[in-house]
């Protein structure tokens, strides 16, 4: 099955502590059904000092489950579901089901 969420997509968080936040997808992990979204689901990690980096408490993004993410509609900015359609020239593109606007292509 084709990926509905890809790297670089603008997404909206649907549930959890960051509900309503918007961000760009940094990476997608299809085997885990998770994605890394910039500036969302921030967690603190305690890191040991190494020869290259100093130790301390570091804040970074954690993965978010794909079921808690929706693509941002290019027209309205609201969360939307994603569909696929084939254009006249034979290309398969994603489109926002709410507005019918193509997401890529």
From Swiss-Prot:
Signal peptide: none annotated. GO terms for molecular function: rRNA binding; structural constituent of ribosome. Transmembrane segments: none annotated. Gene3D superfamilies: 2.30.30.30. SMART domains: KOW (SM00739). Keywords: Ribonucleoprotein, Ribosomal protein, RNA-binding, rRNA-binding. One of its GO terms (biological process) is translation. GO terms for cellular component: ribonucleoprotein complex; ribosome. InterPro entries: KOW (IPR005824), Rib_uL2_dom2 (IPR014722), Ribosomal_uL24 (IPR003256), Ribosomal_uL24_CS (IPR005825), Ribosomal_uL24_KOW (IPR041988), Translation_prot_SH3-like_sf (IPR008991). PROSITE patterns: RIBOSOMAL_L24 (PS01108). It comes from the Bacteria. Belongs to the universal ribosomal protein uL24 family. HAMAP family: Ribosomal_uL24_B (MF_01326_B). One of two assembly initiator proteins, it binds directly to the 5'-end of the 23S rRNA, where it nucleates assembly of the 50S subunit. Part of the 50S ribosomal subunit. This is Large ribosomal subunit protein uL24. It comes from Parvibaculum lavamentivorans (strain DS-1 / DSM 13023 / NCIMB 13966). The gene is rplX.
């Amino acid at each position: 099955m084709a990926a509905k969420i890809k790297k670089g997509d603008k997404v909206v968080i649907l549930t959890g502590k960051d509900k309503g936040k918007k961000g760009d997808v940094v990476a997608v992990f299809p085997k885990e059904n998770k994605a890394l979204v910039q500036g969302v689901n921030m967690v603190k990690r305690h890191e040991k000092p190494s020869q290259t980096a100093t130790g301390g408490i570091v804040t970074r993004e954690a993965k978010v489950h794909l079921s808690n993410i929706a693509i941002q509609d290019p027209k309205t900015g609201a969360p939307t579901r994603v569909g696929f359609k084939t254009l006249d020239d034979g290309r398969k593109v994603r489109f926002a089901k709410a507005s019918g606007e193509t997401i890529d292509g």
